[in-house]
């Protein structure tokens, strides 16, 4: 038969004392999570962050999301849904996402009302993509480009285009313009350039995330415009450089502010940002622009693109806890430092040191329940 084994009874530590020690340990560990003493990687605790907005930087943000998870050891999953700058701004203002991407800086009234700060995270170019197989290389200047999108120039063999492209045999086909159908930071950048170089465009259409383009085909997002240009003969449209390169879409060489024809490259985009003076993260960004920048090597449709986050991350309207707040700021810090090395392979220019310094100051000022996160 089975034998019952009993241990000798000894006087030991009272059970109430043991229970008290266990409770104390639990409290200490919980406090460590709450104060960030344990990193997400060390604890194994999963954190999920969500973003949405500009498609201009989306290839880079998606790359960052993967590399941050794979290289840092932090168990932080970041999803970014695109949707356009306008949609991203709406979602961050409604606190439906943790961060938003936008190529169009907010008006001071909006950033102040919502308590949002700007973090420029990369530099890019908007290029003029075209689908006209008979043209080997296309050169355009700003005024001619504005005339095309205002439909004052409607055929590829127009004298204004011919004058810029000596030696090219231009076809007589009608030009089909492809534009963004959604509220778009890329449209904000492109229309801003046209408004800078054409007083007629500025007076009739102006700069905006949405423009009432005449007789144009609309498509959603940079991916949508890219594919529509590729599949529409005799068309012209505007997309971010990364999309043109990834999809082998030809794009025009543009005449810049100083009269030089310049292709969109990392170097020409960086040149456009040389010497730019930026405000504080919670300052007025509404007038920040590097469009039509001076300099022989500057590409004329270059732009910063921004991440928007709340200066105070705690809110009764969201479920963000302190661990998530720390993860968000750590991710953004990584993006403007280690993350910059991933930009050039995707045709985004790395931030100048002076811009990184502005971002550092901004990130070091962000709080959770009144306490600085970093």
Predicted regions, residues:
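Secretory targeting signatures
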Residues: 1-46
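Flexible loop/hinge segments at secondary-structure junctions
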Residues: 15-18, 36-374
